[in-house]
Amino acid sequence: VGPSFIMTTGSIEDALGSGLLSYWEEHAASLSSVGVLPERLLVDDAGFRDVVSGYDAGVIAASERITPLQPDHLAYVIYTSGSTGTPKGAANSQLGTINHMFWMQDILQLTEEDRILHKTSLSFDVSVWEWSLPLIEGSCLVIATPDGHRDPVYLNRIIQEQSVSVLNFVPTMLSSFIDAAVPEACLSIRHILTSGEALGIPLQESVFEVLPDAHLWNVYGPSEASDDVTYWRCQPEDKDLTPPIGSPI
């Protein structure tokens, strides 16, 4: 991964459409990463400039690197939906990504007993911390089925079956989840983070009514800034306070 390369692994979601693919083709070189090649692979007409095959997936020693790793080196590029125009790549550094992870650990205080639900599409920045945050403290990663985030009944079931303790919602989906929530099935929830839309007073009250023991966090940040830049912990007694975006992380 680098400033002039886009590396893709796995499939590209249908929901992204052709706009993102055409943007990639226009603005970046193509590099296909293939672990095991079949005897024949038709790549001559595929438009790839390079094909990396048969690489050792083990740890790369410092002596093997062309240049040393730096905190400002690229960690990942994530593409916006393009809902307001052409999709654009948001490049985030190693330093920004790690800073975000350590901040989340500071406020959530995760342990090996926690279980984080990964349900956000990989095309959205929230997914980055959902699957990488468990690595900070050895927490367990629980992976939802594709499109499971759209089904409140399914979410109730997986939360209860897997004892999920940390999860993220956009307020619209949080509202649907709370409306369908079975309190007895959600006793394991310690932290709910909400982002992507404004969190209103009625929804805040509903969360505390249904899940009085859960911590509710209102977080805000653009994809270009490693996901979150401000946060606010909602309190049950703040019934008349519209949750602000809060303080810098």
Model-predicted segments: where are they?
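Short-chain dehydrogenase/reductase
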Residues: 101
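Catalytic nucleophile serine of serine hydrolases
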Residues: 81, 96, 121, 221-223
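Short alpha-helical segment within the catalytic ATP-binding CA
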Residues: 79, 127, 172
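Carrier-protein-dependent adenylate-forming modules in NRPS/ANL systems
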Residues: 1-98, 106-109, 115, 134, ...
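Short Pro/Gly-enriched coil loops immediately N-terminal to beta-strands
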Residues: 247-249
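Adenylate-forming
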Residues: 9-37, 104-111, 123, 136, ...
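Short, well-ordered beta-strand segments
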Residues: 75, 91, 115-117, 123, ...
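GHKL-family ATP-binding catalytic core of two-component histidine kinases
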Residues: 70, 91-93, 125, 170, ...
